[in-house]
Amino acid sequence: MSQPLILAIDQGTQSVRALLFDTTGTLVGRGYQPIEPYFSDRPGWAEQHPTYFWDNLGQACQALWENTGATPDQVVGVTVTTQRGTVVTLDNQGQPLRPAILWLDQRHADIQERLPGPWGWLFRGLRLDDTIDQFRRNAQANWLSQHEPDTWQRTRHYLLLSGYLNYRLTGQFRDSTASQVGYLPFDFRRHQWAGQRNFKWQLMPVRKDQLPELVRPGETLGQLTAEAATHLGLTSGLPVIAAASDKACEVLGSGGLTPDTACLSYGTTATINVSNPRYVEPVRLMPPYPSAIPGHYSTEVMIYRGYWMVSWFKREFGLREQRIAEHRGIEPEVLFDELVNSVPPGSMGLMLQPYWSPGVRHPGPDAKGAMVGFGDVHTRAHIYRAILEGLAYALREGKERIERRSGTEITTLRVAGGGSRSNAAM
């Protein structure tokens, strides 16, 4: 019998990857499809058509079969992980009503009045009403109901991107509990939709019947439909297994299984995560997200625009290195590492505050990025090193906060994400 394989699909912000693993976790095949992260019809908006994600998922699978010796009949199961917090609205026929609103989107609902009733009184008494109102402003459902009421009226299914792709794979509206990261009426302590009397239902107009059925990671979501099987180049009827969000899978894959082991993610969003069987909030009223390990929590500190800032620097200031790298047939990262190494630690007093986009609770919705300490000695190289150092210090601050909140010392660091390929960043 040929070796059984699992097809894992990673739908990220900038690419789709179709990955084949054997039963020991060894990668045996890879297909890669770059995508346009989003389009923006207005400043601060970030949208993409749901069908665009699905079409490119198929392209990634096609690239996989063209570049591996493995065959589709070896695949015994399929699983999907996606970017977090991207919202898809479908009508009663399962068709998208509008472009997906990505996690990068910066639009806000207009909140004029405080939350009424007993919950509102309680939050005002605890001085948490500003936090609650920020949640209401950020919830995409509130913006949709205010600015696109016809669309919201027709919304039968309110899904994250993971739920949409699992629907396209199985024909069922089911999703993993470990993928529910966003502005949703989700009980992060119990890993289920919030109870009927929970205050979260008052924060947004979402109904429970609009949400998918939830399944624990590792359990079966459904079977691959004939249409989806053709799209992926597989046999219909294969089990589709519940995975987790991309960050949660990254933590699991890097071996972050215990509270004393932290996973640093050098991705578009830079994070430090710790898996814990206990519910530990990194900041008060900021819940730990569901872990890929059933029944566990992922305590996370996030730098929203993390290693996106590295891409920003390369785009705005790194054209020379990119052209030289193309001419020499090497990766641009080699030259950028040389740029960093030409500058002493500390960037000769140039410091960066890495908040190109604000946080909800920390550092707060009004935070701004800044570079401080410029002098006549500073060059592009100093700016680049200051970016890396600013991110590193922000992640260190996150590590220390998690240690204080959990009462557990972090003794091991695991590093993942695109930025981990840079020796200078490491």
Question: What do the predicted segments below correspond to?
Answer:
Residues 1-99, 114, 154, 229-230, ...:
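N-terminal glycine/serine-rich phosphate-binding loop of ATP-dependent small-molecule kinases
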Residues 66-103, 129-135, 166-186, 213-218:
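Short beta-strand-loop/turn "lid" adjacent to the catalytic site in phosphate-handling enzymes
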Residues 7-9, 23, 116-132, 136-174, ...:
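Active-site core segments that coordinate phosphate-bearing ligands/cofactors
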Residues 45, 103, 301-305:
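Short alpha-helix boundary/capping segments
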Residues 16, 38, 87, 111, ...:
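Conserved protein kinase catalytic core
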Residues 101, 105-120:
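Short alpha-helix plus adjacent loop in nuclease-associated cores
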Residues 36-39, 106-108, 307-308:
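A short local loop/turn or secondary-structure capping micro-motif enriched for an aromatic residue
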